[in-house]
Amino acid sequence: MLVALSPLALASGCGATRRAGSAPAQTPAPAPLTASEIAALIPRQVRDRDGWSEAIANALAANEFPLDRPSACAVIAVIAQESGFDADPAVPGLAAIAAARIDRYKAKLGPFGDPLLERLLSGRAPDDARSFRERLTRLRTERDADLLFRDLLAYYEVNHPALFTAAQWAGKLTDLDGLADLNPITTAGSMQVSVRFAEQWARAHKGKTATPGSVRDALYTRPGGVYYGAARLLAYPAPYDRVIFRFADYNAGFYASRNAAVQEQLSRLSGRKLTLDGDLLSYDRNGNPNDQDSESERAVQAFAQRYAPQLSAGTIRRDLLGEKTIGFEGTETYRAIKTVAAQKLGRLAVYATLPQVAVSSPKLKGTRSTAWFAQSVDRRYQTCVATPAR
């Protein structure tokens, strides 16, 4: 019987031992961790460790991940980093952040901005005595902001469709796709998982019962935030030799660490300076690839002219469209780059490297980097996995 191993167990080299000249020996599968054993891995200062451990155990089981120490510690480390074990974290200055976002929208509408926004914010949801403006000034948590903007859109779409349509079109005249883009909450919950990812995951695994509103509501609960966060962290194959690269991917996007290594090697081979951001294509605000060539795509084209003339521009674009999947590694473009890199760069032709991405957010004080995030989470992870059994 083969033992099912988590991606993290594989990355850490666990699972099999072998003596010289003998057939591979299969290590027996460890017993799944219990909720109480997971609780012992959570930092002592965390309130309600039993509740958090139950949420983690249920999330791993629901997503069909092994209930082992590497998986549990990875989730624990991200929760500790992202929210300090708070299902609905408060955001300092959130009211000012949301108001500034609305003011930028208003300013781009010129003379129409003030009267339009005044009408929008003067209304109120049927189940709340406060106006939208009053609620805006009292925002404290992510859920407060999320519900405000969702209530505002729902109220005007149903009760004042003409005003709603005007505001929607006004949004499209700015840099917004619509009023929904005024909502500053794009990551949510204890693991700060991407709302877009959570909605996609829910559609794929929960079907028609998963509406955007229900997914957002779930993210602000302890079970829901951990369920979607664990899925985002662990539910994709990546043969990294160190788990820190998976933590970087959590911050910068699927396979960002692998793709950053590709960019680094392309830069050396093509002579073009590239930002190692883990994106081989450029993307719009909704995550769709742009039509124009990115700097990395142009570097691949320059590489192909010199080393792989069989790669056409069409082949390169087709292959790069799969850069967020494991399947990218089977493409002509990836194989050509890695083959030449191995020949020309030797030890520098690594599989993964930490992306160099500046991370700024209305919810962060100052600017951080993906490397800083990954290293900070990894320190928490290493402490967790080294925790003695109790």
Please give the residue ranges for each predicted region.
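Bacterial N-terminal signal peptides
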Residues: 2-9
